Amino acid sequence: FQWAKRHGLAVEKDNMNEIIIDKPASPGCENVPRVIFQAHMDMVCVCEEGVTYDPMNDPIKVINDGVTLTADGTSLGADDGIGVAMCLYLLQDDTLRHGPIRAIFTTNEEDGMDSMDIDPKYLDGDYLVNLDWETLGSLCNSCAGGDFFNYSHKAEWEKPIVGCKTLTISFSGLLGGHSGVGINKGHANALVSIATLLAMLRQGGVSYCVFS
């Protein structure tokens, strides 16, 4: 918000803390269609095993080897920091000739898609370009969606079985991957793998109880 003010750009913030910045057209390009560029500001905050990291208070330690930016022990935030950086570049570069530009920086994309509730008045452009695609130099003409559901189950508590052995099962070292572009790669999912193992034990006649 303050960055836009310093650059003399019109800026608004809605009740979801989303930032909307407008840059007027270059002289002679006033009648060129308006393009809206959108990127999201939130990120997935994870860290490597053994790393102490509080994303609300600890800064990201960026490693720059001259070619690639990575983070030291944590996620970098390139999703969608790259898109945010692209928007800021377009807004601050006065050497580019362009029509009217609007940049929308949204919040809570990773776990809620709350930006669907943005005021439609901010979407009055001719083109909308989402800067959250996977590959530089390519465009994806499509849309994505998601669904949420709640599941509840009333647990029936039992006393521990006397004389049984206690085991801890953990799955780690998996390849992971993006649930969108990596869902077809056949990588193992830890939750599914544990559930499959428990089902196989039950089918094999192994009696067990699960506790937390």
Annotate the PLM regions:
Residues F1-P33:
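A non-catalytic alpha/beta surface segment that caps or lines the substrate-entry region
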Residues A4, G8, C45, D94, ...:
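Structural signal for hydrophobic packing residues in well-ordered secondary-structure cores
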Residues A4, V84-L91, I194-L198:
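Buried hydrophobic packing segments
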Residues V11-E12, I101, V206:
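Hydrophobic anchor at the start of a short beta-strand
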Residues V11-M16, V32, G81-A85, M113, ...:
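Conserved active-site and cofactor/substrate-binding residues in soluble primary-metabolism enzymes
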Residues C29-D111, D117, G125-D126, T166:
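Active-site metal-coordination/substrate-binding segment of hydrolases
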Residues P59-K61, D65-T70, E109-S212:
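Midchain, well-structured core segments that form catalytic/ion-binding scaffolds
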